[in-house]
């Protein structure tokens, strides 16, 4: 009796091969011809064999690179949004550690505050930055603001004049909502305490802002031209209750007496004078 030997059925790929792929005859999966790792895997589910597509090694590397770029872009957009919201004066963008000229040794305390931010935040520890006019208090605070914003921390740096201008004319409920919005920021920095108008309304609103921040248990940084003695020995109850709240939560930091603003102005004038003296007037024909 004649026996017929059946020719084995050839196993073929379950989809069309791309130009950079080949079919592995051993495990019957499609492979990448560049990295020689599979682009398919085999799973058995309820008695059926499934062969889904997967990323080979080089595809996975490209995917991870693209994902890293996407996350970086999202982070940059988030930081830009935080800066737009938190830095209400464009000049504040330049108040960074990278632009520090080393004149104020106290700037190391700003570095330390940023480095220990999580602990400062947990303890609701703020700073009271005080000193004479033009000594770099706003720059000190701005460096902290920008450094934390770069880390993705929501920071608002503003001043009481701006706050009071916003609150003026608002109804009671609207004022409360505005003050509550200030507390959404992880760090609130208020520049130039003491230069705002000294009316009963202004003092009441300044207290409301400080007291609300105090009760929120979130850090507050204040800059002021007032001396520590003036803050500790307020002239009246209205000022005392404001200053007491600040001194309870904010570590005093004195910025030295050198007038950096005046030094910068003098340097700019010297540079302008040098330009004028070194450039000859054009010939008049």
Model regions: which residues?
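A short, basic N-terminal segment
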Residues: 1-101, 265-285
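Pre-Walker A (pre-P-loop) alpha-helix and adjacent loop at the N terminus of AAA/AAA+ ATPase modules
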Residues: 87-91, 96-127
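Structured helix-beta-strand junction loops
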Residues: 95, 151, 184-185, 216, ...
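Short glycine-rich substrate-engagement loop in P-loop NTPases that contacts/grips substrate
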Residues: 105-114, 124, 145-185, 197-204
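Walker A/P-loop nucleotide-binding motif
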Residues: 121-141
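SF2 helicase catalytic motif II
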Residues: 189
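Walker B catalytic acidic pair
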Residues: 192-193
